[in-house]
């Protein structure tokens, strides 16, 4: 097997192949340009089904809020909690498991792949230059306060009570 892209999707696939014994008597090449895996992001999502990464969850919420100018709406999400996974814990778990299999290898800066007798998974998105793409960007900052300022039992998914500057802006507070 060959997995192009060793980010969240590629590593998740490799992990599932490994824990379900699909790599027995097989080789797996993961092509990823990064030099090292370290905490570089947080993945957050609504938990709609069980997953294998409960031990990587940094925080889980069953309550959230949405702010608009002069109003805050509070909602519950008991059946579908919102979870945040720490990428450092995720990388440590997956790479720890994959490194136990001598038939799994990571490669960087490959210019060419011999795909004979290989099944290739490409997790790198192709972006068409002639197509109008819609992007959603998040810039994250972790802050610490001397006093309790945030209620850690509720997260604010969208706070629109800020300058909009002719486009949509909001704060997202976990």
Predicted regions and their residues:
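Beta1/beta-strand and adjacent pyrophosphate-binding region of the FAD-binding site
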Residues: 1-9, 29-31
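Short active-site-adjacent helix-start/loop capping segments
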Residues: 38-39, 74-76, 114-115, 129-130
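Residue-level preference for alpha-helix termini and adjacent loops
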Residues: 44-45, 60, 74, 81-84, ...
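Predominantly flavin-linked oxidoreductase catalytic cores and closely associated redox partners
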Residues: 6, 16, 20, 97-174
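Short, surface-exposed, polar/charged, turn-prone segments marking secondary-structure boundaries
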Residues: 55-60, 93-96, 146-150
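Conserved beta-strand termini and adjacent loop/short-helix elements that scaffold enzyme active sites
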Residues: 31-33, 69, 76-78, 107-109, ...
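N-terminal FAD cofactor-binding segment of flavoenzymes
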Residues: 12-71, 88-89, 139, 143
